[in-house]
Amino acid sequence: NINIKKDSSFAMLLEAQRRGYELHYMEMADLYLINGEARARTHTLSVEQNYDKWYDFTGEQDLPLADLDVILMRKDPPFDTEFIYATYILERAEEKGTLIVNKPQSLRDCNEKLFTAWFSELTPETLVTRNKAQLKAFWEKHGDIIMKPLDGMGGASIFRVKAGDPNLGVIAETLTELGSRYCMAQNYLPAIKDGDKRVLVVDGEPVPYCLARIPQGGETRGNLAAGGRGEARPLTESD
């Protein structure tokens, strides 16, 4: 499921191969525990910058995860119980000395949307709730808001609700599944027309360029998967 035109996983595969690493590919269903040992069924592969045929599987094996030097956890959301179980399996390999990127405990602790609550001074006004009345009050206060699920990706199920929109109720019911799931609401920031920014941090240091994702064609969403245009930009002082 890797899109080599935009997915950073492909760039990582190319660079790891260039540095002489043997590449192993595995999915969630390939991970398992046996008597406390983390193992996986893996495919070795080679990659190349070729849109028609960018990978070739070269072998298949079943091995302890502790035999691998580095594991890059690249699973996309949803952040569900299966995702959490996978981090526990990876943690067993981490205890044996394998470098897991990112750290399994951090993947569990730092939900990419909810974790913003730990630095709310840098975010729009944000409400996380499953209560429809609270969502309505937040909308009435701001008049123009963004509503989204906590476990989505790629711009899926993100709604902009303007003042007077008659769909607020059904959007709230859909996102919260009639009050049984949390969702997030934020006041709309017009600056999104200039793009949002993805800043990468490696070992605590920001990469000097960020990815700006710019909405296209009247869209609110800048996600590349939703048609946004990607643009590399140098970091500013405020970034």
Q: How would you name each of these model-derived features?
A:
Residues 101, 125, 146, 184-186:
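Short catalytic-loop micro-motif centered on adjacent basic/acidic residues
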Residues 49, 149-151:
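Short acidic, glycine-rich loop/turn motifs
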Residues 9, 132-133, 140-144, 151-239:
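Phosphate-binding site of ATP-dependent enzymes
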Residues 29, 76, 104, 150, ...:
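Anionic group-transfer/hydrolysis microenvironments
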Residues 17, 94, 139, 175-176:
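N-terminal cationic-hydrophobic initiation segments that often serve targeting/anchoring roles
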Residues 3-128, 134:
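Conserved N-proximal alpha/beta basic substrate-recognition cap immediately N-terminal to
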